[in-house]
């Protein structure tokens, strides 16, 4: 199978072809996803909650991300693999480069970092040194203590304009992908249309170029609070492979996320 690349996603955006992505943390699920044609995966710091059992993503280390990245890469050798740089792993551009090198050596094709215009120098430095960057705006879980919880971001003119400005700044600095989390559909549409790079949404309506879900949310195995934007595809199909195929099909057709999964 031909490898999926950043250029593949760029072509999807140009062709207005929606695409599905998912988090993965181990060999077995990565192989299953790849076998079903789901070829864009993220080793997310969400593993702190879903795999390690913490109440936030903050305890996750670069070593944790590298370990899981290597496992996922073995299961899905041809996927486009993103890896999060966890909390405090990119406080300076130099630190970001050192930690990005670690996860790239483990098998990542691209690193994802959370934050807006303050990251411009970091994004430039990484991009100039052949480390592709995915930005992450909106609800950025590493900032949970600043936000005072997991809340929708970008409501109101000032907040929405700031997020659009952040998105444009990240793109100008060299970011090649952007994740938008928990923002109003109207803002997600503005940002997706304003950027030349692909935008992946989670809790951002069906107006973005792609969608991502935490694997555990997509299969209904999350303990505790279930996000509004989540859908349990396993409950509808009763078979995990069929659930993966249904998730992909609903994203590609624009059925998921529906109005009931979206914010305004």
Swiss-Prot record:
Q: What is its EC number?
A: 2.1.2.11
Q: Name one GO cellular component term.
A: cytoplasm
The broad enzyme category this protein falls into is transferase
The family database entries (Pfam families) matched by this protein are listed as: Pantoate_transf
Question: GO:BP terms for this protein?
Answer: pantothenate biosynthetic process
SUPFAM superfamilies to which the protein is assigned, alphabetical = Phosphoenolpyruvate/pyruvate domain
Pathway participation:
Cofactor biosynthesis; (R)-pantothenate biosynthesis; (R)-pantoate from 3-methyl-2-oxobutanoate: step 1/2
Explain the purpose of this protein: Catalyzes the reversible reaction in which hydroxymethyl group from 5,10-methylenetetrahydrofolate is transferred onto alpha-ketoisovalerate to form ketopantoate.
PANTHER family cross-referenced by the UniProt entry? 3-METHYL-2-OXOBUTANOATE HYDROXYMETHYLTRANSFERASE
What this protein is called in its record is 3-methyl-2-oxobutanoate hydroxymethyltransferase
Instruction: Give the organism, scientific name.
Output: Shigella flexneri
């Amino acid at each position: 199978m031909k490898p999926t690349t950043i250029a593949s996603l760029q072509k999807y955006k140009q062709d207005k072809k929606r695409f599905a992505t998912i988090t993965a943390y181990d060999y077995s699920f990565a192989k299953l996803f790849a076998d079903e044609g789901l070829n864009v995966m993220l080793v997310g710091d969400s593993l702190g909650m879903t795999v390690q059992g913490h109440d936030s993503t903050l305890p996750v280390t670069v070593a944790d991300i590298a370990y899981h990245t290597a496992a996922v890469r073995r299961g899905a050798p041809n996927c486009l693999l993103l890896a999060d740089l966890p909390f405090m792993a990119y406080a300076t551009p130099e630190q970001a480069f050192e930690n990005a090198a670690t996860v790239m050596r483990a098998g990542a094709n691209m690193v994802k970092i959370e934050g807006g215009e303050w990251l411009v120098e970091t994004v430039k430095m990484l991009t100039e040194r052949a480390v592709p960057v995915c930005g992450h705006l909106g609800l950025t879980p590493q900032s949970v203590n600043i936000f005072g919880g997991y809340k929708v971001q970008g409501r109101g003119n000032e907040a929405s304009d700031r997020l659009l400005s952040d998105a444009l700044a990240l793109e100008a600095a060299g970011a090649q992908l952007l994740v938008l989390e928990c923002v109003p559909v109207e803002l997600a549409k503005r940002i997706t249309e304003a950027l030349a790079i692909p935008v992946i949404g989670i809790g951002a309506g069906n107006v973005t170029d792609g969608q991502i879900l935490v694997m555990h949310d997509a299969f209904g195995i999350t303990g505790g609070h279930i996000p509004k934007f989540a859908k349990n595809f396993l409950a509808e199909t009763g078979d995990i492979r069929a659930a993966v195929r249904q998730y992909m099909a609903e994203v590609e057709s624009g059925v998921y996320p529906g109005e009931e999964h979206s914010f305004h």
